[in-house]
């Protein structure tokens, strides 16, 4: 695992995946690696009135645990994104559309991973430059970035070694920012 950056690629007409595939494979000479999917579930705490956010990374067994604790948690919404993984040098690019597009459709999820380091300070400028090269000028992207109020260290994550939990936190913040759930 390297350092990732999570983006929302604004795509109002739904043609982004074709354009993205063409740009990656033709213009940037990347190759399609395999299929990629991500499933996002939003649970609500039945008893709590607080607004604290919690990230839980778990395998399918977590659903069994939550089922046993169903009097504490309520599944509010599930969204499945399907797409592809591409590779260009030291970068893995994962892109996916929501399986069911509805009136709230806002674009594609894009996860760009720089695989040569786990240090976010080293990877940040490299990822920024690569993302700028990756996106066509007419496309808007939305990206959550840590700041003083919402930093990785404020939730107990390392500022020097990137993990899957860092990526999960980016997804959570992006989904909150863009009202994707």
How should these model regions be labeled?
Residues 115-117, 177:
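Positively charged, low-complexity, intrinsically disordered RNA-binding extensions
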